Design a protein with these regions (language model features):
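Well-ordered secondary-structure scaffolds
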Residues: 1-271
Length: 271
């Protein structure tokens, strides 16, 4: 295996974090590129929180925000993962990654190309394997989750969340209007159906309530003071009230996807 191989991951949300954690656990060097204002809701298991906090930790993995590519080496020496704000990917060429993983999960390609690394991998729909990237990994819950796709694309986004505890679309909450999101509860709280968990302050100063449809644990919640538009995802409820620890653990879905990415990375590096 190539010594000091570099895996560059675009995105630091919860699914991306699952992949980064698996690669880091395997002893690989990983660099995360993120947006200036990440909008993850599963913030307790998202390395992108380092953008706001300076550093964060998920299941023993410490992530540290850096301001320049040159600072990455010092973070790696600390057995941590550097996070660089670089939504345009300007640092990709100078970083010369051995593998690039697009884990932005934007449901469309925001600029990743096959020539960015010897192996390019994309998670989820919006990419065609063999054209936009070398390989695509399926992200839709179900029998095909984690499947490695070398020709074609992942299943298109349906806009309907996967079923957890018997609930699908009811467990995900979206903004009903534009404004500034203000939380009233925190991740890990048990909430009841119909409860107000946040408010949105509109341009005219009105406060619009954000309510839940089901009872459960508040597994994900958008960072307070974040600007939202109608339909913007702001919260995620887990109906399994006994599963509080899930708020702070990488999900089964993220780990399944991560396993496929690790398989691809190892195959590439052992060539």
């Amino acid at each position: 295996m190539k010594k000091d191989a570099l895996i560059l991951v675009r995105g630091g949300g919860d699914l991306a974090t699952g992949t980064v954690h698996r690669l880091w656990s395997a002893g690989l060097r990983v660099l995360v590129l993120e947006a200036e204002h990440p909008a993850a809701i599963r913030r307790q298991v998202s390395l992108c929180e380092a953008v706001y906090e300076g550093e964060t930790a998920v299941e023993g993995l410490r992530a540290v925000r850096i301001e320049t590519l040159a600072q990455a080496e010092e973070v790696w020496k600390q057995n941590a993962v550097p996070v660089l704000v670089d939504p345009q990917g300007k640092s990709i060429a100078p970083a010369k990654p051995d593998v690039l993983v697009d884990a932005i999960l934007a449901k469309k390609n925001l600029g990743t190309t096959r020539d960015m690394a010897p192996l390019t991998i994309a998670l989820g729909p919006g990419f065609t394997a063999g054209q936009d990237v070398d390989v695509v990994v399926e992200t839709k819950r179900g029998h095909r989750l984690g499947r490695i796709i070398r020709e074609g694309s992942a299943i298109p986004d349906t806009g309907i969340p996967g079923i957890i505890g018997g609930y699908g679309k009811e467990r995900v909450i979206h903004a009903g209007t534009a404004g500034i999101f203000m939380d009233l509860r925190k991740i890990g709280d048990i909430v009841e159906a119909g409860e107000t968990i946040a408010q949105i302050r509109t341009a005219d100063g009105a406060m619009i309530s954000v309510t839940t449809q089901i009872t459960g644990i508040l597994r994900g919640l958008l960072r307070s003071s974040y600007p939202v538009t109608p339909g913007f995802k702001v919260a995620d409820i887990d109906p399994r009230k006994e599963e509080l620890s899930n708020c702070f653990l990488i999900s089964d879905k993220a780990r399944c996807i991560a396993g496929s990415v690790l398989e691809l990375v190892c195959t590439q590096l052992w060539k």
